[in-house]
Amino acid sequence: MKSVLAAAAMSLVISDFANAEETRGKAMMKIEPSAISEADIRSVSPALARFGREAITEDLWTRDALSPRDRSVVTVAMLIARNQPAEVKHYIDVALDSGVTPAELSEIITHLAFYSGWPNAMSAVSVTKAVFETRGVTPDALPDASPDLLPLNQEAEKQRSETVEKNVGRISPGLVKFTADPLFLDLWQRPALTPRDRSLITVSALIASGQSAQIGYHLNRAMDNGLSAEEAGEIVTQAAFYAGWPNAFTAAPVVGEVLINRSSSKT
């Protein structure tokens, strides 16, 4: 009996060690900055190959202000928003290897159809389909078309609807209608993404698109849903490489204002 218990205990130890090694391996996974190989990049621009290796692979993706999983989500959202299908395909693979599920990626594309436009989402669909086929992802691994929705925060929805009606009701009644349903009464209530993740990809897409006027509302919503100040700042850092320095610097003052206002309200 003692030998059986000892063997069971040893099995648990080995299992825990293996799981720890797997987790550590994921955390230390080398992220290639592009679908294009470093050798091919070097054949055109040795400096670009060096910056990609030193700044992106060896520095940016090793920073701990965002988890590898969240960093890949942010990057996929930014690339979809900027309609970069070749790089979307590469980073869909990175995201899957970093712990993002096929269901979450499916829902990210759905969400960004509204925030980056249908054509950008269709570009993402075409390349993601190929990745899913290669990895054997089947339809039953994807979110339902019409699932049971998350509970609605009635007070927040009332405030949102009144603000939208006041600001654009006379200008575009159709925009008011579709902003309510399907955007906030359906899309935002779908359970395939947590509210935090849904806000995370929205903020990332807005920063990547240079839509600074919309960042404040959605960043506040993201932080209400659990995004930290450090994570918010790191999204801007990630944007510098994947959406360009001008977009990062356009977003930085808006993000800073949100962080200052939230900090002041707590004192």
Feature locations, PLM:
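Intrinsically disordered, low-complexity segments enriched in Gly and acidic/Ser/Thr residues
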Residues: I207, A213-Q214
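Extended hydrophobic/aromatic segments used for targeting, binding, or gating
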Residues: L219, N225, E230-A239, A243
